[in-house]
Swiss-Prot record:
This is Dermonecrotic toxin LlSicTox-alphaIII2. It comes from Loxosceles laeta. It is an enzyme of class 4 (lyase). Mg(2+) binds at E32, D34, D91. It is found in: Secreted. Its cofactor is Mg(2+). Its EC number is 4.6.1.-. GO terms for biological process: killing of cells of another organism; lipid catabolic process. Binds 1 Mg(2+) ion per subunit.
Amino acid sequence: ADNRRPIWNLGHMVNAVKQIPTFLNDGANAIEADITFKGAVPTYSYHGTPCDFGRDCIRWEYFDVFLRTLREYTTPGNSKYREKFILFVLDLKTGSLNNHEVRKAGENVAKGLLENYWNNGNNGGRAYVVLSLPDIAHYEFIRTFKEVLKTAGHENLLDKVGYDLSGPYWPSLPSLDSVHEAFKKAGVDGHVWLSDGLTNWAKLGDMARLKEIIKSRDSENGFISKVYYWSVDKYSTTRTALDVGVDGIMTNYPYVIIDVLNENGYKDKYRLATYDDNPWETFKN
């Protein structure tokens, strides 16, 4: 058996459809997009300024068009299909929404995915989806999201969905206990991705938070399935992140991650994740 740790190589800030093949060609097996809301309505895949150094911050697409395009790349038999493209993270920009809007936003994102990505359950895209929310107080987004799929008779699609509650970042990050509490309130057991990171222009810290999350993931009663780190553009940082034990690395340069995964000392311990790797299972070696 192959007992190397599977790694998700996440293309960062992929918001225009033209960028999707570029990142996949560079070796990404997953992408992250920023979903911007007008009120409770997910409207664009768009980040805006400021963003990572060396990147165009204002590339965008309409949310429904973006999802339909993702579907093409992840539906076997489609001319655009890429077998290695196995997961995407929706970085949901719900920071300015009130509680009522957060609940509505959960419904709207579920409806959008159901119609435009899963094709109402009729041979839709097969990739796994991680819904990433910026505030643990927004756990009700997850509840209403799940409710919509259940009511529509597509509860099975929740097998493909994971969740990340990573903030707020200001004034200080929530404790892992309060993060766990929020997941319980959301009714989420398993299917948990947690992220930690810095913009690529920030000085690399001591990774204390990252190490704490990884320790929690690997503990006896850990609630975290996978841990990913962002945004990593350097060979040295990639090696450090892998050494610490991450499952995913979000990067502006996916080929850097591929290069490191092929290096001596790394290729015998890590490999690029494939569709057969369950993103909701904690890796045990």
